[in-house]
Amino acid sequence: MIKIGTLTCLHSNNVCARVGCLKAFQNRSDFFEGYSLDTFLGAMMTCNGCKSTNPKEPDEDEGILEKIDRLVSEEIKVMHVGACRLDGKKKECPRITRICEMLEDRGIQVVRGTHRE
């Protein structure tokens, strides 16, 4: 059994119920293809928000650091990052990019995608 999780944009909580991500995982479709049925979705986290609402960069944000520590302690091996990481020009949010780097630095594989992009 492998434990995986999702990382999504805090701001997207205003309009997203995570239905697409969860449905893709449940059906093992899109970016979740290839996972066995015993794969465990063990974490769902958000970023620390936009700079305009939270001036702390992810490296300095106690909440993000605590979340990543918890992912490691729970033995989450892969984090899938939602399409909400992309702006209208399909450019990835720099805060999400940094969080992905932080995850990889701690040995957690990052997959950019959940359901369709």
Task: Please annotate each region the language model reported.
Residues S73-R116:
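Short, compact, well-ordered microdomains
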Residues M1-I68, E92, Q109:
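Conserved mixed alpha/beta catalytic, RNA-binding, or beta-rich assembly cores of soluble enzyme
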